[in-house]
Amino acid sequence: MATPSMMPQWSYMHIAGQDASEYLSPGLVQFARATDTYFTLGNKFRNPTVAPTHDVTTDRSQRLTLRFVPVDREDTTYSYKARFTLAVGDNRVLDMASSYFDIRGVLDRGPSFKPYSGTAYNSLAPKGAPNASQWSDNAKLNTFAQAPYLSDTITAADGIKVGTDTAQAGAAVYANKTYQPEPQVGPSEWNTSIENVKAGGRALKQTTAMQPCYGSYARPTNEHGGQSKDDNIELKFFDSANNAANTAQVVFYTEDVNLEMPDTHLVFKPTVTNGTIASESLLGQQAAPNRANYIAFRDNFIGLMYYNSTGNMGVLAGQASQLNAVVDLQDRNTELSYQLMLDALGDRTRYFSLWNSAVDSYDPDVRVIENHGVEDELPNYCFPLSAVGEIKNYKGIKPDNGGGGGWTADNTVSEANHIGIGNIAAMEINLQANLWRSFLYSNVGLYLPDDLKYTPGNIKLPDNKNTYEYMNGRVTAPGLVDTYVNIGARWSPDVMDNVNPFNHHRNAGLRYRSMLLGNGRFVPFHIQVPQKFFAIRNLLLLPGSYTYEWNFRKDVNMILQSTLGNDLRVDGASVRFDNIALYANFFPMAHNTASTLEAMLRNDTNDQSFNDYLCAANMLYPIPANATSVPISIPSRNWAAFRGWSFTRLKTKETPSLGSGFDPYFVYSGTIPYLDGTFYLNHTFKKVSIMFDSSVSWPGNDRLLTPNEFEIKRSVDGEGYNVAQCNMTKDWFLIQMLSHYNIGYQGFYIPESYKDRMYSFFRNFQPMSRQVVDTTEYKNYKKVTVEFQHNNSGFVGYLGPTMREGQAYPANYPYPLIGQTAVESITQKKFLCDRVMWRIPFSSNFMSMGALTDLGQNMLYANSAHALDMTFEVDPMDEPTLLYVLFEVFDVVRIHQPHRGVIEAVYLRTPFSAGNATT
């Protein structure tokens, strides 16, 4: 192999093929040459990919896909290894690009899986409404219930009458107590009279623990829908409290049921004696729905196959030589490379179910809130079903014909006419404001950092903060993200900026992947998983016999993704692989074409060479909690073929250790930015300085700001260096436009759509600004904390998503920033830029920008090797994070198959490392 020098030797990075003129008809060749200036065929007719038109003689030649079954399996606690023997016959070429692993197994998503918002059970019930219940107080039984079924007869022995038997001369039919009276049956007209009638209903005994009706479920125990546990249904009879005659007017069929709350939990529970399951106080319990938690395989099955982990990789080796062509480096990021490559090839917003390809996303209206208030100019009313006001009974009268202008009773008119006086009774609700407030609480409030939440009183949550039960049970004071917070501004709540926005139930990609598996906890799955490793992903495998094996993870936190990022190991998820097969295609070529291709590729000048799409050395540097400076050093080396830096920031909690087969400290299952590209901490960088040795000034002093230093954002901008109404510097904006789109100092314009990809700068750049009270200039400012702020008092719960309390009273927060009485304010600016990796390009042009030597040469050219020192200044974060830096180099593999069953690989990566599989 050629020795790397100042410029990459592209002469050995190609696949040579027959020129079209060697095998196309002379007429077509002449046509191509004559029309080449305006109708270029390029290499459209390269020999290796020409389809067969003759010599296809056997059924095997025409069989497109072959199924390989493993010759060896190894199923362990943490992984599943499958080994295949690939036998490629004469005059065949196996297309590794078409191969995929076909995996069948069983997935248990665990009890934390909840693929919807809200509840499936009694979702229309008020959150604090109880079920029909009984309890004992002072040795007496109390009942709180509704009796909806109306009849004309109640007997002590048979209960309430539900009909007559026409076959037996109108004999009365009484309720079958196992399911009648049914709770869903009552008067079907609003004007049904309840005077002088008998009524019946069902109620839960005091031995069934009280729960709110919202979210309550009890399984049926008979085909009629009855729910009694044991058919021990007791009839309890009641009469009006002021009726001395003691006649049965109401009967309740009381029972014990298997009462559950499958998808809700309590957010308010009154204080009761320990062990109490039914009491008058418990009627006031309040339920809330469990938080949505979609669980699915990751985008493009990230994490399922082992990459970047020594000892857990795979093998592709010729059986004649046993040389493994798979040589991975610890600092190569195959998964991220595949994500970015797919984005460059197509539209990632289009889902492709075959590879589980549905990219992680978030609702931009949740990340950056445009709080433009609510359009509630007209009031919204609700009316009683009768559409009248308060009704009183009136009798009919008529003028007294006896004269004198008097009145007398009208015996032709009823003595009980139901008449309301004045306007129709109505209640008002501000639908728009309630919908907006509910949106903010469900989408922002519930995702606030845990230190801004609290555990409701009398509710016991587990100590492990990574469990679903803990995350689900914590509640937020709605005032932190209410309709009036930042009203009129386009601003992201500051406390949410460093919270992973992709771990959200509005992550449409995760929701799609979860629904692909279905809506149940237990899933027998059948998936197709592609090979992503760049050296063998697109390989043409020539005739011979090869060993191909790979490891598949079984760690649920790595292979599954959840909305909340809870620890799926603790929360009961599991996966089992029952069968892994390999499907692969032979090129459908004529035999003589295939043999020509084979002969061509056996020639060592026609080796197959592949670039890793990312082409970078990946390095992670720890940033301790609350640290603001990160120095890194690279020892002296030749920087030829170096292309620049990309960098971002990751949370340690969200980054697994890929060097080990199983990371016991990875107790998280949300998105893994390191692997899937869901970066979101770019806004936390302040500046970066770059020094080649101490003597080299790079990139020179002809930029806006200090040499050797790239200022990303500045909070105080006296000179006016910031851009776009935010705190990003013009310098950094230009560098990003230059490195992503080649739009540099020649001006500002929007990049073409084909360049502005999902992971690029311009699409994800979100500048924003707002005004806040100037606490120094506004003399009447008082720092009123959340617990003492009131706005909508009397109409909302106090510091929680609970029943409204309080009285109507003037609000004391926030200070007005508009109108005649606007207070003094200051402007705050910031930006977000998710999914992107900041880039600093390094090229021959940039090398020339350094200080010149006496000989007129740049120091970087004059010396063959230089050490690199970089210092990153970042915003402090209260948890450990990682600086993720890509050193963009050339990462190339050259595959050589000189003989049958022999495969050799040479890896070239300059200027960082090289390796080979030939020795």
UniProtKB/Swiss-Prot annotation:
GO MF term list: structural molecule activity
- Point out residues bearing the modification N-acetylalanine: 2
Q: Which residues carry this modification: Phosphotyrosine?
A: 907
The residues that cross the membrane are: none
Quick check: keyword Transport in the entry? Answer: no
Subcellular localization(s) per the UniProt record:
Virion; Host nucleus
Q: Which UniProt keywords apply?
A: Acetylation, Capsid protein, Cytoplasmic inwards viral transport, Host nucleus, Host-virus interaction, Late protein, Microtubular inwards viral transport, Phosphoprotein, T=25 icosahedral capsid protein, Virion, Virus entry into host cell
**Which residues are tagged with the site Involved in interaction with pre-protein VI?**
744
Intrachain disulfide bonds: none
> Which biological processes are named by the entry's GO terms?
microtubule-dependent intracellular transport of viral material towards nucleus; symbiont entry into host cell
Q: Name one GO cellular component term.
A: host cell
What upregulates this protein?
Expressed in the late phase of the viral replicative cycle.
Q: Which family is this sequence assigned to?
A: Belongs to the adenoviridae hexon protein family.
* Function according to Swiss-Prot or TrEMBL: Major capsid protein that self-associates to form 240 hexon trimers, each in the shape of a hexagon, building most of the pseudo T=25 capsid. Assembled into trimeric units with the help of the chaperone shutoff protein. Transported by pre-protein VI to the nucleus where it associates with other structural proteins to form an empty capsid. Might be involved, through its interaction with host dyneins, in the intracellular microtubule-dependent transport of incoming viral capsid to the nucleus.
Other facts? All late proteins expressed from the major late promoter are produced by alternative splicing and alternative polyadenylation of the same gene giving rise to non-overlapping ORFs. A leader sequence is present in the N-terminus of all these mRNAs and is recognized by the viral shutoff protein to provide expression although conventional translation via ribosome scanning from the cap has been shut off in the host cell.
Q: Tell me the subunit arrangement.
A: Homotrimer. Interacts with the capsid vertex protein; this interaction binds the peripentonal hexons to the neighboring penton base. Interacts with the hexon-linking protein; this interaction tethers the hexons surrounding the penton to those situated in the central plate of the facet. Interacts with the hexon-interlacing protein; this interaction lashes the hexons together. Interacts with host dyneins DYNC1LI1 and DYNC1I2; this interaction might be involved in intracellular microtubule-dependent transport of incoming viral capsid.
Protein name, as recorded: Hexon protein
**Organism from which the protein derives:** Human adenovirus A serotype 12 (HAdV-12)
